[in-house]
Design a protein with these regions (language model features):
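Secretory targeting and sorting signals
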Residues: 37-62
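Aromatic- and acid-rich polysaccharide-binding/catalytic face
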Residues: 115-124, 153, 253-283, 345
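N-terminal substrate-binding region of glycoside hydrolase catalytic domains
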Residues: 80-178, 312, 344
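Substrate-binding cleft of secreted/luminal carbohydrate-active enzymes
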Residues: 79-96, 197, 304-381
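Glycoside hydrolase catalytic-domain groove-lining segments
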Residues: 135-156, 271-313, 372
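Substrate-binding cleft of extracellular glycoside hydrolase catalytic domains
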Residues: 130-241
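C-terminal region of N-terminal signal peptides and the immediate post-cleavage residues
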Residues: 54-76
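Aromatic-lined carbohydrate-recognition surfaces of secreted/lumenal glycan-active proteins
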Residues: 93, 202, 226, 230-251, ...
């Protein structure tokens, strides 16, 4: 499906942060007083084997779900806001044409050795005309994919390929000028779909000013869409607010947060662009840690977080470097407190040296191993 990317600044090498919002990936939970008392029980030699087994099981139950535990245990099932309590979702943006999304998703999954949890797609706000359906949320292909995946729908206030006059503005959206033909129509489509979906409005909004309006205009437009959905009885949307996470935009990002009552998840998109923006090579940790800590300190200290796009350019002089980068992902991810989803961007950005897709078999094999980690394999139901 065709889509336009907003201009995205690269992420400069971050300054050192205290890491106060990060957790030790190797930290284990306390067994609790009940388990400790049971361990202190005196048992007879005739029952030692069974008693030890009972104590071990009690210890596990008292500790709660183990970080990264997979399976169908009731306490690892997703919450009402689609949070996986025992780990994190793995998803991706998979390049596709209008009609072949299911096939492209299956091909990606075959290559990476597992099913995706979240499939990420993009839409504009154009009106349906003839065969055009870029503005149609939940296409037939998305519905097919959604039978056994979660969907993240990115909805942009654009008319791709349209005239300047056709481009929606945040002020128009906030004033309700798009309600009848756009907002209400798509709200009803989502309501009819029934299953919960992640929905993002104007991702990377900090790159869209002043062309689309002011930060205040964005907040009003976002809140209007949210309130309009609620008025129409749409209760199966998980509202996902996605910024670049580029810290030179920190003031702008803070102004564009719609508020805790309007946001369920907070996402950010950080990459190792390398030569794409003539930047130095950044590890996965360097692309994530500073932004993660800033968001926890300045936007929300408790909302679930999503690495809504992550990835790296390749290094032509060191073909193994991309593979080494992806190998770091599980270990770093476990230390990012509150991060409950990570979506790989398997495509390119505009510009020379800006192909962020997996470049070779070694990179694919590395990602395959990384996303086989139990932490990234959680029950969808």
């Amino acid at each position: 499906m065709r889509f336009n990317r907003p201009h995205r600044p690269f992420r400069r090498t971050p300054s050192t942060t205290g890491g106060q919002h990060r957790k030790d990936p190797h930290q284990t939970q306390s067994a609790g007083p009940l388990a400790s008392r049971r361990r202190r029980l005196l048992i007879t030699s005739a029952t030692v084997v069974s008693a030890v087994l009972v104590a071990v099981l009690a210890l596990r139950d008292a500790s709660g779900p183990e970080p990264g535990a997979a399976g169908s245990r009731a306490d690892c099932r997703p919450t009402a806001l689609l949070e996986p309590p025992c780990g994190a979702w793995f998803g991706a943006f998979v390049p596709h044409e209008r009609d072949d999304l299911p096939e492209k998703v299956r091909a990606y999954e075959k290559r990476v050795g597992r099913e995706l949890d979240i499939v990420y797609t993009y839409h504009d706000m154009s009106l349906a005309s003839g065969t055009r359906r870029e503005g149609q949320l939940l296409t037939p292909e998305e519905r097919r994919v959604g039978e056994d995946h979660l969907l993240l729908l990115s909805w942009e206030s654009k008319w791709w390929g349209g005239t300047k006059r056709q481009q929606p503005t945040w002020k128009q959206i906030a004033a309700g000028e798009l309600d009848d033909k756009v907002i209400d129509v798509q709200a009803r489509r989502i309501k009819d779909y029934g299953k919960k979906v992640f929905l993002s409005f104007d991702l990377e909004m900090d790159t869209r000013t002043p062309d689309n309006g002011t930060p205040a205009d964005y907040v009003k437009a976002y809140r209007h869409i949210h309130d309009r959905f609620r008025a129409l009885g749409v209760d199966n949307v998980v509202w996902t607010w996605i910024t670049t996470g580029y810290l030179d935009h920190a003031d702008e990002i803070k102004k564009m947060y719609p508020g805790d009552d309007y946001v369920d998840w907070v996402g950010y998109n950080q990459y190792n662009y390398y030569r794409c923006h003539e930047a130095g090579w950044l590890t996965f940790a360097q692309t994530q840690n500073a932004t993660h800590d800033w968001i926890r300190a300045n936007i929300s200290d408790d909302k679930p977080l999503m690495l809504s796009e992550f990835g790296t350019a390749a290094d032509a002089n060191r073909p193994q470097r991309q593979a080494e980068w992806y190998a770091e992902v599980p270990g770093v991810l476990k230390g990012l407190e509150g991060v409950k989803a990570a979506l790989q961007w398997n495509y390119r950005d505009p510009g020379p040296h800006c192909n962020l897709a997996l470049a070779n078999d070694a990179a694919w094999d590395s990602l395959r191993k990384a996303v086989s980690d139990p932490y990234l394999n959680q029950p969808l139901k």
